[in-house]
Each structure stands twice: as structure tokens, then as C-alpha cells.
């Protein structure tokens, strides 16, 4: 016990021996851009507005965290952490640890847990050396951010357990322009006996003692990305996915903020795991008040055996720091992802307005009805026509969700001569009154198989299954095991054949169920690695195809998918009122340029709500990929007359949405008048989306203050007057709305 002053003093002395009394003076081994400064004892990563510092205790080799926040220079004030020792917490649990291992007196959740052949899970990872790399190496088999030597510098810190011969490399890549630090870790078995990695975090950080709050995105099918903000309490709290994919339920995103932090003011730390599989986000406030945040693999679905010489690499985690509130955090994510994550040529290219056949026809179509829908789409000004589910399956035709998945050949009853004649006819159509040819796109769900399919009858062993346990169906389908190379090759070959057969310029890649009955805990990660191989092969082979990800809506809206697919269907819920919440929630981490958003028919298929077409269109065009989800023949005449103008407006705002900065001025959960401002990359143009949700009877309408403008510049507002940026930001503007579900799109031009 530490009851007596003498024992407390002895304990304090021993604790200081382990972790040191404070940072030592930094030597000057510096990267060319000053982004990384290291001397083997202290380490500093420097961005335009961020500093990240940690050090090595020279006695024990432990890494100790010092700072992650606003820019600092010079020596650090010598802090302390060993005063209050009158408790039972192990000594290591009282300090801020950079990469906490397991079993040595730190009883908080560890960043790594490894079971050795003898059964114990103790590790003693000590600092060995470091290296600084200009640029950023790619992660083997995993999506990762990228950049040139001018964009990013990487620090790798090498740790080693002398008792078990386990090596861990910690990678820190700093993008100074974005105040972003990207981290990952790998574990290598340097010994002769097998080890099993049971937990591995990509990112770990211990915040100092202070009151903090955490923000996450929760939801379910058709109500993804609902913002949740709560106090960080003492003890363990967190969330994750065990579905085998990132999921609708929780997103692999976390923000840590102060209670006073708002959209535009205060500090915010954002974390986003670049991974599409099951994950875990853990936040623990320990007994000393230190808050630990970890993001990485879900330990319940990780049991990864490493033989001698083998390595397990974690996904990477992007962390950003903002002193400009939650909005500043989001804009850092957006800029980084547009420029250094999404590899597609379409990352910042104008996206064609499209019409998807799903909500217009569902499964009920043939070649003539599809062509009729394409004709009517072109007449409205649509430039891309997408044929959704229902076009494939020969022996088991896909006329419902009960059959056909896995058999990627055109349904001979619907398309007797294959897809080529249809594609040729559709791509001869002109978009509206222009000379632009209509493009053709296709829906696929290659990771699935129906039991009613030729594929399943020939290869029942290709689906996920656990011995003799029943194979649980969801949506009448099973999941192909992409951990198997032969399954990966089959999917690559089938999709290649389809894309080579006709002029298909767009693919919507869907995924409509969770993973059950996996054969082993490691299969989940093996599946994701196989999926990434498929994505990488196909997107590299067909770089001119615009790929869109989907998983029953936003079930796989994560950075891992974004590397390969520049846009993702945000939600199967196309109700415009709910979409405002979903899209603004998604924008906490993900750029609007990546969001698919469609104007659909009313009453809405998901909610039954009827909302004016203008409001529906304005909400949809806040996404980078604007489209229609309806049958034009079913539109009322007044609605049909408005649609071409909405398409033209969407095309006008699209370049600003794709490359500009987003400012969430008001949130739908906080105001009857949510508003979003997009400002072009050069600052010369801006577009304001302004909504009234409910009626406002006999009551004033609030003024709306803009943000992000140049206070000294003058702006033309919709061509009807000129106002200074200072006036628009400090006084604001005011509009009258006529009714509920009214909306306005306002253009600003810098003069």
C-alpha cells in the first residue's frame, strides 16, 4: 500500500525512474521541411498549426506522450505525474503512454495484446531506433494516403521486446498543410515460436487530464451518420462494428473535443480509420483522469497467428487537429481525402447528373422498358443512365431478390442479344438539347451469391460457412468468401468480362448483408484484404470507369472504400428531410464530393413523406454525385417541368461542391433553418444552401451569418447587391420562406 508518506515518496521515485521527469532538450536532426525533428530521445512532428511530441524514457525504453495540439516551439515545460500514488493502480497506468502494451501494470485498454505460445500476454516493447522517410510508403495490401516528398514526411519508430523477440514498428506520416498525422503499426515475430495477435490498434493517444467530450456517428439502415456527442466519463466507453464491414451502425470515426467546442470555435481532434472491416473505437478515462483513445481492429474478430518472420500490418488511422472547431476538423479531412486518399481520376472532376432505375422500376423491366426510361431521362437533361438490379442471371434469372446473384451474365429473356445492343442504343441518345451523348452505367453486387444460382450449385464451398452450422440467409443471399484467392479471381474475371463487352462508363458496386458464420476470427481481415485486391485490380484495369460504392446505402462509407471508389451512395433513404441530417453527419469526416445523393419520387419510398421537388433537388445537389431516383413518366407535370432547371443548377454548383470548402452554418438537429455554405477552392465563388424545415407562423426569421469569406472583399449576392465579407459574416443575411420544406440556393461572387 502507498499509505505512508515514505512509501508514497519511494513509489514516486520509482515511477519517475520508469517514465522520466519531463522532456529532454531536443537535438536537431530535422527533415528538409521541418515536419519531423528527432534525435532518438525526443520526437516532434510539425504541421502548419499542429505539433505532436513524444519521447523515450532512457532507463526503460518506454515511449511517453507529451503533446498533440496547437503549435509549440522550443523546450517543453517539465511536467510531472507521480504525486498522487495512494491507490492500487499500477505505475504504468499513471502516465501518458504512446503505444501501451499489455501486462506490465497499465490496466487501461492496451494498443496491442499478443498471446505467446506459452499462453501469457505480457509484452515489454522498448525503443530501439527510428528512421525518417521523405514521402510516405504505401501499406502492403491496404488502402492508404499518399503524397510526394513535398507533401508528407514519415517517421518510423522501432520497438522491440527482448524477452519474446517481438518487433513493433510505429509509423507516423505528417501532412503539414492539412495538420494531419497518419499512423499505423505492424507486429513482426522475430522469434522461433508462433505468436497470436489478439488486439492491435492503428492509433493510440493519451490526452492529459481535462474534461472532454466525444463525437461519433451512429445509425442503422436508412438512418446512417447521426451525430452523437457525449461526455467522456470515467471508465471505458466506445463503439465499433462486428458485422464484417464498417456498417450502418457505427462509422470508424471519432472526434474528441472540449465541452465548449462548437462548429467554428475551440479545439477538435478527429480520427478516422482507413478500413472497411470490423473495427473498434475505444475511449477510456482512467482513474488519474487521463483519457486514452484507440482505433483499430475489433479484437473480437482478430486472432492472427504469426509464425517466425511473419508480420501483421494494421490499417492506418488519419488524425487531424483543428483550433477552428469541428468545422475546421472536417475541412482538414475533406482536403486531405480529395488530394491524398482518393486515387480515381474523378476525385475532383465534374460528375454527370444521373438517373438510376431502382426506385423507378425496381426488378420490373425488360430491354424496351429500360430504353424508354433512358429516353425520358435524356430528355430531362440527365447525362448518365444507370440500370440497377435485375439485368442478370440465365438459369436463375434475377427477377426478384431470390435468385441470380453470382451469375453475371445478362438475363436472356430480358436481353436476348446481351447488353451490347441496349448500351449502343442508349449511348446514342443526347442529353437534353445538348450534343452530349448519354452514358451508360450498371449495378453489380459481386461479393454475394444466391443459393438459387449456378455459382452456388457449382461452388457451395465458396461462401462463408462454419463447418456444419446452418448458413444464415439475409435478403435471400450468402456472402462469398473473398479470403479465397479463387473467389477473388472469379469476381475480377466476371466484372472484367462485363466491362469489356460494352461501353459501360459507371459501375455501382453494392453489398447488401452482414457476414455470418465466418470460419475463423482471422477470416474477417483476410476477407477485407481480398476485397481490396479485387478493388485495386479492377479500378486500375478500368481507370476511365466511374466507380460508386454502396452497401445498402452508407454501410461502407469509410476511407478504405474511398481510395478506390471516388463516390459512395450515402443512404438508401432518399427522403430529403432525413437526408440533410445524414449528409451533414457524414460530412464530419467525409468530403461532400464523395456523397451520392438523388432526387426521388414522392411520397417517398422510405418515409411516405411528400416534399416539394425544389427542396428535394436542393438537398441532393449538396452531394458530389447528383442524380434522380424515379420514373419520369410518373412525375406530375409541374414537377417534370422543374427537373431540367434543377439538373442545370446541380451542374452549376457541382464544381464548387467537388473542390471547395464546406461550412455547416446551422445543423438540422439544432435549428429549423439549417444552412450550408460551400466556398470554391480559390475563394472567388460561394454557394449557400438554406432550408426551412417547419412552418414559421407570425414569427421573425433569424439572420444567418456566413463564415469563411474574406472580410475585406466585396461579394455580389445573387447579382442583386454587393456586400462586404465582414458584413455578411458579422451581420449576416435574411430571407423569407413561404412554407415548410422551402429552400433557397444563393450564389456569391467575389468582386
UniProtKB/Swiss-Prot annotation:
InterPro entries: Aldolase_TIM, Alpga-gal_N_sf, Alpha-glycosidase_related, Glyco_hydro_27/36_CS, Glyco_hydro_36, Glyco_hydro_36_C, Glyco_hydro_36_N, Glyco_hydro_b. GO terms for molecular function: alpha-galactosidase activity. One of its GO terms (biological process) is polysaccharide catabolic process. Gene3D superfamilies: Aldolase class I (3.20.20.70), alpha-galactosidase from lactobacil brevis (2.70.98.60), Golgi alpha-mannosidase II (2.60.40.1180). Its EC number is 3.2.1.22. Glycans are attached at residues 49, 57, 162, 186, 194, 366, 433, 452, 500, 720. Residues 1-27 form the signal peptide. GO terms for cellular component: extracellular region. The active site is at 510 (nucleophile), 572 (proton donor). PANTHER family: ALPHA-GALACTOSIDASE C-RELATED (PTHR43053:SF3), GLYCOSIDASE FAMILY 31 (PTHR43053). Homotetramer. This is Probable alpha-galactosidase C. The gene is aglC.
